[in-house]
Amino acid sequence: YWVDLKNPYVTLDNNYIESVWWSLKELYKKDMLYEGYKVVPFCPRCGTPLSSHEVAQGYKDVKEESVYVTFKLKKEKGEYILAWTTTPWTFPGNVALAVGEKIKYVKVKLPDGDKLILGKDRLNVLHGDYKILEEMTGKELIGLEYEPLYNIKELKNKNSYKIIPADFVTTEDGTGVVHIAVMYGEDDYRVGTKIGLPEIHTVGEDGKFLNIAPEFIRGRFIKEAEEDIKENLKKRHLLFKREKIVHSYPFCWRCDTVLLYYAINSWYIKVSEVRKKMMELNEKINWYPSHIKDGRFGNWLEGAKDWALSRFKFWGTPLPIWRCDCGNEEIIGSIEELKKKSSKKITGKIDLHKPWIDEIKLKCSCGKEMKRIPDVIDCWYDSGSAGFAQFHYPFENKKEFEKRFPYDFISE
């Protein structure tokens, strides 16, 4: 409600939404708004992605079990490569193992005769006696094939179940070998799409395993199925080690459900394209306390990613984009434009929210009708629009807005 209690702005009002729509259309015209398929923080209970600042509100230090698992190399009898993860539920989605090209690896012989490959700097994870047989770089391991933990035909192609190079592999923890589940990690997705790994989900948006997953976990929530996944690997002599750790993990700030990093279709704002400009402007701002400038806020700007704007909810400002089956799309920037482009005359009371807005179809040049993309937008975009949307700018109060903008003082 701001300080002016006699003239509050309310984000659910049509005037406010119309100003937000105008701003989104301006971004669209500048090629700053785009649709993309990426891995985003996702709440399986709320059924929607979260923005980076929403995620930052829900981190907790949790104590849980990490696991070390052996992957059997195909061409060498009794040879395995060791990988580590804190998210065993992603194992059914495994399609590759990543190594660092310049990292040093060793092949060791264990007391039972099996041979194991892991990072040289991570030998401390081994139990008991072992003998180093060979040393090599990660580059020498690239291309080796291994047997999948689970036979899921949808995840098989010419590139899957091989050792691949990746620039994010380290020996700070784990084994120097990263298990890749393309659909459940930002780095995994980036490297997976680059080399053509299968982009197939084993988990649904509700956090439950799909029917392509192994039968014993189908239809079960990921965290509830983790123990059975570990026991299954143990019975097959693939679970090498369990280890309790404390690590920071994000939970939904609304419902306290564990978040997934989940590949999904969403609309994005190209924040990365204006990152440099935002950092320059930040230097001109007087922050109180001053450490925020180069600390919390400065660090956020430095690593700012494209903003996942879509939310898969009922309540919120609707994304004003309509699309036809032929592929044509239209973004609406005002109520007047909506009336003009609607396939039927709009009469009666206008409510820009769902479900009213989804009854509006637009005329397409192909002769068919366009339907609105059903997403709503991140409520933080509504909040960030207050500077202009409270005045119903640019439809009203232009002078009032221009007199105040840019604002001299912002209290957060």
Regions found by a protein language model. Name each.
Residues 64-66, 105, 319, 376, ...:
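Extracellular structured ligand-interaction cores
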Residues 33, 106, 130-135, 350, ...:
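Short glycine-aromatic motifs
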Residues 92, 96, 103-180, 186-190:
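Protease-associated
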Residues 195-207, 313-315, 333-412:
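Alpha-helical recognition segments enriched in aromatics with Gly/Pro capping
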Residues 78-86, 96-98, 398-407:
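Internal mixed beta-strand/loop scaffold within catalytic domains of large alpha/beta enzymes
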Residues 1-92, 143, 153, 168, ...:
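Residue patterns forming the tRNA-binding/recognition surfaces of aminoacyl-tRNA synthetases
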Residues 135-168, 257-280, 367-396:
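Conserved oxyanion/phosphate-binding beta-strand-loop segments in alpha/beta enzyme cores
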Residues 78-86, 114-124, 133-134, 329-336, ...:
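Short amphipathic beta-strand/extended segments with alternating polar/hydrophobic composition
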